[in-house]
């Protein structure tokens, strides 16, 4: 944990003056939340510098309405003058300000003014992407021309530009960038054509992509991947009939549809709950010499699970085993989850303890997570803890944040906040794990419900410091709770964050 965050949380505790019993509980929450980072001094140093610069830009009064304002702030600040600037630090800063193009450009301008620093192509690519996201097309084009002069434009750059144009509905501009590939020292070939087509299809511009293909295929030969791009594009647009037509077109060009082609269509049928057509497609795959693989069957099972059709999902698993398809860890993780939700705990245990080892299928973190979640869901927390200890002592894999989420949920369910603190401390001090957005959100919401918004607020501060954007609903809940306790400074801070940081939109 950076000294800035430690001081911020420490000052918060002094202002709040909580009870000694609450401090005992909370000390297991926040203390050493970033211990994992402290094992790597160079990472901590870079992180601390990023935090300092962030506070120079956002945490102080004054204008920052333009990149020049940000540049002046950074150039005149004594802390920034002592910063050990690196490509990694610039990347981290640009990532933090990816939704604030003025600050991002101000950072680039300041970095460029620092002695001995020269921007990497990655920094330029990020700037182009940030400007494209903000639809600042003229500024983006300026950067592209600058990159062209320095011969820094790559296919990755082109992909970012085309994606932003296509996403904004400016698909002609995206095609125009492709037409200029020669100016950037890049070649128009099947690879670059597929990049354009894939960009258009992913942005649901599949019809425009079709027009482009018809124009280009006379001098650029499509390959099997070209047709798979369109199959995915049509399915994403929920137009499965066109995807099926593309399968026929693919055959007409001498390419045999592969398991990826069919599985993409099956996934679309699953999303439409057309499971009869799913089974028809499975039969067609077998007849055409492209038998379903483990991913195909797992996709179907996951979709059935989402519909709570657990018994039907188990029948799909049986069909897979009978077909001779070799199962993998992903399939077994899904099978364990299915058995757990169907209430067949003993069968899930047999799969985990007997079937997977016998077939030589590796047990990974997700496998353990499925078993731990199963035990927690069925209120068998002792078995979940035993399995966690087994996982820790094995050489197979290590726990991750998702390992602990069902355990934390169980603790809150029975009102054991002290155990929550112990688990959190174990996560960060023993396994050097960093909390993710979903875990922070879960903890903040549950602490608010438990009338412990002081500690929820401190986790909120830590969340912001880790570059994790809180959800709009989380901010509103926390703001309401701190106002109830007359935590005026905390309320002002939350409101400031809500104004200056682009929050995840509320669920409608």
Curated annotation (Swiss-Prot):
Residues 1-74 form a transit peptide. The keyword Repeat applies. It is found in: Mitochondrion. PPR repeats lie at residues 120-150, 154-188, 189-219, 223-257, 258-292, 293-327, 328-363, 364-398, 400-434, 436-470. One of its GO terms (cellular component) is mitochondrion. Keywords: Mitochondrion, Repeat, Transit peptide. Belongs to the PPR family. P subfamily. This is Pentatricopeptide repeat-containing protein At3g04130, mitochondrial. It comes from Arabidopsis thaliana.
């Amino acid at each position: 944990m950076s000294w800035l965050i430690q001081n911020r949380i420490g000052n918060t505790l002094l202002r709040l003056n909580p009870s000694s019993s609450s401090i005992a509980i909370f000390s297991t929450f926040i203390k050493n939340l970033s211990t994992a980072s402290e094992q790597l001094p160079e990472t901590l140093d870079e992180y601390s510098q990023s935090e300092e610069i962030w506070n120079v830009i956002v945490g102080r009064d004054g204008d920052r309405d333009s990149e020049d304002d940000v540049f002046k702030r950074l150039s005149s600040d004594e802390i920034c003058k002592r910063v050990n600037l690196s490509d990694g630090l610039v990347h981290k800063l640009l990532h933090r300000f990816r939704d604030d193009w003025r600050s991002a450009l101000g950072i680039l301008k300041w970095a460029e003014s620092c002695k001995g620093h020269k921007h990497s192509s990655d920094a330029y690519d990020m700037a182009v992407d940030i400007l494209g996201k903000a639809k600042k097309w003229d500024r983006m084009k300026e950067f592209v021309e600058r990159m062209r002069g320095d011969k820094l434009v790559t296919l990755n750059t082109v992909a970012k530009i085309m994606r932003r144009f296509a996403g904004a509905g400016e698909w002609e501009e995206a095609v125009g960038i492709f037409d200029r590939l020669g100016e950037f020292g890049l070649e128009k070939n099947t690879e670059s054509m597929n990049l354009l087509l894939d960009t258009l299809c992913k942005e649901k511009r599949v019809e425009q992509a079709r027009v482009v293909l018809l124009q280009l295929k006379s001098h650029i030969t499509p390959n099997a991947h070209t047709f798979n791009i369109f199959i995915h594009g049509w399915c994403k647009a929920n137009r499965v009939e066109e995807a099926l037509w593309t399968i026929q077109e693919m055959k007409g060009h001498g390419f045999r549809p592969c398991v990826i082609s069919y599985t993409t269509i099956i996934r679309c049928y699953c999303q439409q709950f057309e499971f009869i057509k799913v089974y028809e497609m499975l039969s067609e795959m077998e007849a055409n010499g492209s038998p379903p693989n483990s991913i195909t069957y797992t996709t179907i099972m996951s979709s059935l699970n989402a519909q709570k059709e657990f018994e039907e999902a188990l029948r799909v698993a049986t069909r897979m085993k009978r077909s001779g398809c070799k199962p993998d860890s992903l399939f077994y993780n899904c099978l364990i989850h299915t058995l757990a939700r169907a209430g067949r705990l003993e069968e899930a245990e047999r799969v985990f303890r007997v079937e997977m080892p016998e077939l030589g299928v590796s047990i990974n973190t997700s496998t353990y997570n499925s078993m731990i979640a199963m035990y927690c869901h069925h209120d068998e927390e002792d078995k979940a803890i035993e399995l966690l200890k087994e996982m820790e002592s094995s050489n197979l894999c290590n726990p991750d944040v998702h390992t602990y989420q069902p355990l934390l949920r169980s603790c809150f369910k029975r009102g054991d906040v002290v155990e929550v603190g112990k688990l959190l401390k174990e996560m960060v001090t023993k396994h050097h794990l960093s909390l993710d957005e979903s875990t922070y959100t879960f903890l903040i919401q549950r602490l608010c419900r438990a009338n412990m918004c002081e500690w929820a607020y401190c986790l909120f501060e830590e969340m912001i410091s880790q570059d994790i954007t809180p959800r709009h609903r989380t901010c509103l809940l926390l703001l309401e709770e701190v106002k109830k306790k007359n935590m005026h400074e905390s309320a002002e801070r939350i409101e400031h964050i809500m104004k200056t940081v682009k929050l995840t939109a509320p669920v409608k």
